[in-house]
Amino acid sequence: MAKNVVVIGAQWGDEGKGKIVDWLAEEAGGVVRFQGGHNAGHTLVVGGKKTILRLIPSGILHESLDCFIGSGVVVSPEALLGEIDELNAAGVKNVEGRLKIAPTCPLILPYHIALDQAREASRGKGKIGTTGRGIGPAYEDKVARRAIRAADLLHPEKLREKLDAVFAYYNVQLQHLHNAESVKAEDVMAVIEKVAPRITPMITDVSRVLNEKNKNGEKLLFEGAQGALLDIDYGTYPFVTSSNCLAGAASAGAGVGPQMLDYVLGIVKAYTTRVGSGPFPTELFDEVGAGLAERGHEFGSVTGRARRCGWFDAAALKRSIQINGISGMCITKLDVMDGVETINICVGYELPDGGKTDILPCGSDAVEACKPIYETMPGWSESTFGVKSYDALPANAKAYLKRIEEVCGAPVAIVSTGPDREETIVLHHPFA
């Protein structure tokens, strides 16, 4: 029987999922994106060469591997084709032949982007921190049952009628609520006519193919985007993304039964980061935080925005472990902690009423009111960069990892000590 693995970000995103998915893909028969859009990038380094993927699964660099975009993903056709062109230019073989898109994927079109950007501009100081790429409005259309989906590209004779109804809805909002320019039907149709000939050959019944692969004993790898603490239901709402980022979303977003999900690997940075607005209890505003940002190259791969940095938040991670059923953790960027003399781990929070909790509360207001409770540990001066053996790690680094396990209640399965595929320590292989 095949063993299937779900990879999710266990913090606020940017944990290093792309590298680990690329590494695990060596043993997979298919890699599947199941939620999100092109609002976050996954950075891969293979042989010193960097590749940034936004929509295409991180297994695409393995040139015999099939990759899938499930119905839980909102797809910008223009962004997708741009990404394919980048991979083709880099010499990656048969990208369009190996990439399959579910017919039920909602499409991101110019009016989604226009509304997303107009809304964010009108929020003033209350900005959520959206990337302005149309992700939220596309998910709104899905729920409101007015989405244009990938399958609609196969029926151009019916598509224009659907679009006319959508234009009326969007242009009222753009013009009258946000004082922005309307979107012209001919501009959107021009985009669709340009992308459809390349998109339609990739449209496939993804759910059926994945289930067939599973029956044939092939291992499947489900790749999440963003992070659990940005989940639309369980994140620090409203400072969240527009989709469910949890392991459970892999089932609905890919079209497989939950019994097919055997192992949940939570990707966890050795410190904590967050992009954009929203509460962040362990955020650092001193030279330690600046040092983490500099050594960790903490800038968004898609937006270029600087990431906020802070101490490891075990209480937040406990919430993520709980809501995802994490089987094992992969600790990334351990090498960024090299040289930090004294390390703090947040093990809980003081609450406004004088009480304490050892797990992240629900909602941004409750999290904003939390004051972190720290345990202090000695750091290490030795370099962990590129170390490939657990025994070769400094004693204090091993003690740090052990304490994370103890406080969070989940085992460390993998340790990443650098951006390259090979800079990885394996304690327990998720596919084993």
UniProtKB/Swiss-Prot annotation:
Cofactor(s), names only, from the UniProt record: Mg(2+)
Binding sites annotated in the UniProt record for substrate: 301-307
GO cellular component: cytoplasm
Annotated active site: 14 (proton acceptor), 42 (proton donor)
Major place of residence: cytoplasm
This protein's UniProt keywords: Cytoplasm, GTP-binding, Ligase, Magnesium, Metal-binding, Nucleotide-binding, Purine biosynthesis
Residues engaged in binding GTP: 13-19, 41-43, 307, 333-335, 416-418
Assembly description: Homodimer.
Name of the protein this chain belongs to: Adenylosuccinate synthetase
Organism, scientific name: Neisseria meningitidis serogroup A / serotype 4A (strain DSM 15465 / Z2491)
